[in-house]
């Protein structure tokens, strides 16, 4: 099974380009569970994504969804859906309302997306891939995915919103393999992308301007200090072209 994950960014000049750490976590988690059953390919460039799509058609495509890449994801997603309407396409990220009315409105407007994964998506995306893996190849379709309920995800099926926000929160973040230590970020580090590293997730505060300020994400969890040190050392040795490390924590310094 071939899966494309895209965290797209404009690349007409090399300024403020960051590693796709988010889809890296999702890939590392599913790859650890499924092994060689799935071939994962990660993309930042829309041109590289579409070139790869023309050369080899995937069984599933996933997009990250942020304010800065919504247009690029729309362009690529609509192109693929027009070319192959049965292609399953999923999306995740904070650029969406979290109430059911907002989710339904988003899915009806963004109709190239079959299933939206809410909050941290490692477990939900693994469940989707595992579901499709169990289907005959001719049943790995958009319609089949949309009719299947995956915890933490929503779809429009038979003109009705289905799904739930039953987010599976990991109790131990170290259960999610590192996208750096597994080598998934190596191509991007080699190209000079700034590495985004997390030391913890979650925030107990409810700031209205922040995507972390919701109850589903208010428990603070941390990666082990040993893992963080290993990641920082790995990045320092591998990032020859970038001069900075970006911390992606919701609230850096909140934990001792």
Predicted regions and their residues:
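Nucleotide-activated donor-dependent transferases that construct or modify glycoconjugates
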Residues: 1-14
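Short, glycine/serine-rich, charged loops/turns that create anion-binding
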Residues: 10-12, 96, 251-252
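Alpha-helical packing segments of well-folded alpha/beta enzyme cores
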Residues: 26, 76, 231-235
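Glycine-rich beta-alpha loop elements in corrinoid/cobalamin-binding modules
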Residues: 29-31, 37-167
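Glycine- and acidic-residue-enriched helix-capping/strand-helix junction motifs
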Residues: 12-23
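Short beta-strand segments
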Residues: 4-7, 42, 62-67, 91-92, ...
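Conserved strand-to-helix beginnings and helix N-cap segments that scaffold or border functional pockets
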Residues: 16, 73-74, 100-103, 222, ...
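Radical SAM [4Fe-4S] cluster-binding motif and immediate context
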Residues: 173-256
